[in-house]
Amino acid sequence: MINIGRLHHVSICINDLEATRHFYMDVLGMDDAQRPNSFNFPGQWFNKNGYEIHTIFKEAAGQVSGDAENIIKPGRDITFARHLCFSVDSVEGTVQTLKEHGVELIEGPRDRGDGATQMYIYDPDGHMVELVYEPWDWE
């Protein structure tokens, strides 16, 4: 058996570094993380509380960025869609920050059924992001 630790990072393909930087740093409050100097392809890393998002330009990765076109299947709940999820410390504060930055809620805030509140948004490249408030994490 492998003894794994926490999830280290998620890597996503992007189109526009400035829009991505604004979303992950200014809206979600992540910090710039140092990329290895040996990386000879464009992208940026973001860090918050020891977790990282690694971004790579779609041309360098040879992949399409985002997946919003196929993400919410008719007749299925949004929770079945591929997404990243970050915990947040306030529903009201999160909604206010999203409004201030012109980020549209695609669903929520809504009760998850166990006392938590879910909100769903898209990043600039169409990656779905869930923001979840679990009050027991912040008490």
Whereabouts are the PLM-identified features?
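Short acidic/His/Gly/Ser-rich catalytic and metal-binding motifs that mark active-site loops
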Residues: 63-66
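Vicinal oxygen chelate
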Residues: 14-18, 78-124, 128
